[in-house]
Amino acid sequence: MTPADEARVRAALRRVWPDAGTVEQVQIRALGGGFNARSFLAVGGGRRHVLRLPVPGSMAWLDVASEARAMSAAAAADLAPAVIAVDSEAGLLLTDYRMMLWTPELVHQSTSITMIARLLRALHPLNVELPVYRLEHFTATYLSALAKTATYAPGAEERKWADELARLGRHFDSSYAPTAFCHNDLFAANILIDGAAARLIDFEYAGRGAPLLDLASLAGMNDFTAAQRQQLLDEYYGTAAAAPALKDLDNAVRMVRLLAYFWGRVAEQRLTEAHAHSELAASIGATLRQG
């Protein structure tokens, strides 16, 4: 971390650190994970917290105050780290630090799938006032943003994917009621696992949605195999008569991947540092071509 970066982080800490008397002695370390270098571990005065800075041109759905409210509800159920402070004006979020692991390989383990399914079953019934996550709305938003970009020239493949996403989104919205408090961004980097339980971070895309949306996010964004997808369905729904079939989950996974692809394409145009987003779009594009 450069001196300029440290000065920027410390200035942000002065706005949210609970103990003004120790903030100048706080040790700061950049944390990995995610698409942007914006999270920092801050240790001092007997405290260990994570500071998250805003990203210019952010693609986040919720504002930081709404995100903090959603995360606090999850934390009250021990499903997320506690929110320590939020500064809506500066876009800052300070949360408790949990020394837990996350790796793409870890979320593929059978025991991890069991833990995450248990976590989602506990998260989804929580009564949190959040906007409804409509797939048709997000599809239209991303495609409209791209269409307004002078440098964007979609080929036949992207036009076909856009039509497919619109169709899948309409079907999903009309077929599955938004009954659950969904996280909607279940990349491995947003899932913390300690061997006994799983917890979630980064609730920027949280909203009311169908439980199947979170299952598709988890399976699609972490490249679950067919066997892992079936285990996820079995762990979440058990013997419920109305449980979706594997084909239903696979269609939702395809939809989530298409949405993430166009999200990445919009980010390429909007963000100044979008290399990771470009790589994501390219990776998802390769997966989509496989069917």
Features from the language model and the residues they span:
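Active-site acidic catalytic loop and adjacent metal/ATP-binding pocket
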Residues: 30-46, 50-51, 166-213
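ATP/Mg2+ or Mg2+-diphosphate-binding catalytic cores
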Residues: 149-159, 262-291
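Active-site activation/catalytic loop segments of kinase-like enzymes and analogous catalytic loops
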Residues: 212-241, 254-272, 285-287
